[in-house]
C-alpha cells in the first residue's frame, strides 16, 4: 500500500469525520432548542452547532503564529500565505455559490439549516494543518502572479482588511458604550416576569441584562463575552404577547451565540473585501440568522400570532450596528421575513445535506493555487553543469540511471518553471515518467508530469514548481 494511497484514505476519513461531526452537532443543537434532551447533552442553554464561530479568526491567527515560531520566518510566512490564499479562495467561491443557491435552499430547507451552511468555513479550517498533512495532489487550477504584483496586492489587501475589520471592532465598542450610556434598567414587574418566564422556558442560565435604551428603534442584543450580554428595548410600552415574542427571539440569539456569528461574518467580509459578492453573501447570511430565529419563535404559533409578529417586525425596523442581533434590523429583508412569518410551512431539516456539503468541502479545498517567481528550472533547483550528483529516470516501472549529467543539466537549465505557494505532504505520481535527482548542495528534486518537487536541506517543507512547457522525456532518456 503506497503512502499516497494512505494519504487519500486519511483525507477521505477526515472528510467523513467532519461531515459526521457537523451533522451530529446540528442535530444536537436542534434537539436542544426543541427540548428533546438526551443523556449526552449537557443543557439547553447552548444551541451552538458544534463549534463557536469565533473559533474561525482565533484559530487562523493561532496556527499562523505557531508555524512562524516553529518553522522560522521563511517557512512560517509561506505557510501563512498558503493558508490565507486557501481561505480567501474557499470563502469567496463557497459564499458566492451558496448565495446563488440560497433561494432554492430556502424553499426546501429550514432557515436554521440555511444559517448553518454559512458556518462551513468555521468547521473546515478549525484545524487547517490536518488538511495540509493529508494533501498529496497538485492543484487543478494555478493562477500566475508576478512576485512584485503579489506583494503589492498583499499590501493593499492587508491594509483594507485591517481598516475594515478594525473599523468594525471600533464601531462595535463605541456603539456598545453609547447604548450603555443612554440606557436604564427595566423595572416594570410585568416585563421582568415575562422575561424570566421565557428564560425558564428555554432553560437559560446565561446572565443577560435587560434595559431600556433611547438610542435604538428595534430590540437588540449585544455582548461578545458570556457575562457582558445585554438586551436593549426601545423606550415604549409593550403588551404581554409582544414582549414574549421579542424576548424569545433575542434569547434564541443568545443561545446560539449569534453575536459571535456576526463577528465571524464581518471577519469574512474583511477577509474577502476585494470580492464584492462576498459582501453581498455575508448580508444574506445575516438575514438567515434572523429568519432562523423567526422560524423557531413561530414554530407552534397560530395564524393570529404570526400576523402580530409580522406587524411587530414592521413597527420595529431599525439599525443594528456592531456585532449585534436585532429583531428587525433591515428594511431590505423585511418583505421576505414577513412573507415567511405569515406563511410558515413544513421544510426539511437537511442533516444529510449538511454532511455532504461538509465532506465535499474538505475534498474540494485547495484545488486553486497561486504561482510566482517564474524563472529557469536551473535557478529554482540551484543547478549548474557540474552540480548534479545522481539522477534516475523511472519509466514503465523501470529505473534508469542517467550518466550524462552535464547534458541533462544543460537541458534542465533551458526549461522554464514557476514556484507555487502551496503546502502539501507528498506529491503523487502524475503519470508517465519520473525524474529524481540529487545536487551537490544536497537539494533533491523530483519531476513528475508537469510538476517539480524540490527539497532544500535548509527548508522543512518541499517546494512545488510547475513547468511552463512540456518535458521531452525521450531526450532525457537519451542521456542515460
Language model regions located:
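Membrane-embedded and juxtamembrane structural elements of multi-pass membrane proteins
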Residues: 30-58, 71-134, 140-368
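Function-determining sites in protein domains
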Residues: 371-480
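Short, compositionally biased low-complexity segments
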Residues: 65-66, 163-173, 382-393
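Basic/hydrophobic alpha-helical interface regions
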Residues: 20-34
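Membrane-embedded alpha-helical segments in integral membrane proteins
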Residues: 1-3, 60-75
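Enrichment for repetitive, rod-forming helical segments
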Residues: 18, 342-344, 453
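Charged interaction patches that mediate protein-protein contacts
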Residues: 1-6, 364-369, 454
Amino acid at each position: 500500500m503506497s503512502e499516497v494511497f494512505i494519504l487519500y484514505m486519511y483525507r477521505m476519513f477526515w472528510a467523513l469525520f467532519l461531515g459526521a461531526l457537523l451533522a451530529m452537532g446540528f442535530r444536537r443543537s436542534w434537539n436542544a432548542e426543541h427540548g428533546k434532551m438526551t443523556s449526552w447533552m449537557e443543557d439547553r442553554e447552548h444551541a451552538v452547532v458544534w463549534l463557536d464561530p469565533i473559533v474561525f479568526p482565533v484559530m487562523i491567527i493561532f496556527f499562523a503564529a505557531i508555524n512562524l515560531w516553529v518553522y522560522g520566518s521563511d517557512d512560517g510566512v509561506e505557510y501563512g500565505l498558503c493558508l490565507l490564499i486557501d481561505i480567501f479562495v474557499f470563502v469567496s467561491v463557497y459564499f458566492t455559490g451558496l448565495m446563488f443557491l440560497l433561494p432554492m435552499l430556502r424553499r426546501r430547507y429550514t432557515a436554521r439549516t440555511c444559517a448553518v451552511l454559512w458556518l462551513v468555513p468555521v468547521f473546515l479550517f478549525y484545524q487547517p494543518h490536518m488538511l495540509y498533512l493529508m494533501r498529496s495532489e497538485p492543484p487543478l487550477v494555478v493562477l500566475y502572479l508576478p512576485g512584485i504584483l503579489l506583494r503589492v496586492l498583499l499590501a493593499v489587501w492587508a491594509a483594507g482588511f485591517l481598516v475594515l475589520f478594525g473599523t468594525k471592532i471600533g464601531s462595535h465598542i463605541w456603539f456598545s458604550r453609547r447604548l450603555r450610556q443612554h440606557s436604564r434598567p427595566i423595572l416594570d414587574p410585568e416585563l421582568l416576569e415575562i422575561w424570566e418566564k421565557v428564560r425558564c422556558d428555554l432553560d437559560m442560565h446565561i446572565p443577560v441584562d435587560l434595559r431600556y435604551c433611547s438610542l435604538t428603534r428595534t430590540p437588540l442584543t449585544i455582548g461578545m463575552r458570556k457575562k457582558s450580554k445585554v438586551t436593549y428595548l426601545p423606550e415604549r410600552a409593550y403588551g404581554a404577547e409582544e414582549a414574549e415574542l421579542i424576548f424569545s427571539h433575542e434569547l434564541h440569539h443568545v443561545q446560539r451565540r449569534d453575536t459571535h456569528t456576526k463577528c465571524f461574518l464581518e471577519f469574512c467580509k474583511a477577509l474577502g473585501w476585494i470580492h464584492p459578492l462576498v459582501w453581498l453573501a455575508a448580508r444574506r447570511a445575516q438575514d438567515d440568522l434572523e429568519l432562523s430565529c423567526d422560524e423557531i419563535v413561530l414554530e407552534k404559533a397560530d395564524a393570529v400570532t404570526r400576523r402580530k409578529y409580522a406587524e411587530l417586525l414592521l413597527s420595529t425596523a431599525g439599525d443594528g450596528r456592531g456585532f449585534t442581533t436585532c429583531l428587525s434590523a433591515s428594511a431590505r429583508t423585511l418583505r421576505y421575513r414577513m412573507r415567511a412569518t405569515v406563511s410558515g410551512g413544513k421544510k426539511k431539516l437537511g442533516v444529510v445535506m449538511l454532511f455532504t456539503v461538509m465532506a465535499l468541502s474538505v475534498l474540494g479545498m485547495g484545488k486553486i493555487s497561486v504561482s510566482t517567481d517564474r524563472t529557469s528550472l536551473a535557478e529554482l533547483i540551484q543547478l549548474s553543469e557540474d552540480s548534479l550528483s545522481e539522477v534516475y529516470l523511472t519509466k514503465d516501472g523501470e529505473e534508469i540511471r542517467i550518466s550524462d549529467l552535464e547534458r541533462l543539466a544543460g537541458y534542465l537549465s533551458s526549461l522554464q518553471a514557476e514556484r507555487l505557494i502551496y503546502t502539501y505532504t507528498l506529491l503523487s505520481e502524475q503519470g508517465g515518467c519520473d525524474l529524481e535527482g540529487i545536487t551537490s548542495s544536497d537539494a533533491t528534486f523530483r519531476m513528475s508530469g508537469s510538476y517539480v518537487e524540490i527539497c532544500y536541506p535548509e527548508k522543512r517543507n518541499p517546494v512545488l514548481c510547475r513547468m511552463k512547457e512540456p518535458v521531452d522525456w525521450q531526450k532525457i532518456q537519451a542521456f542515460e
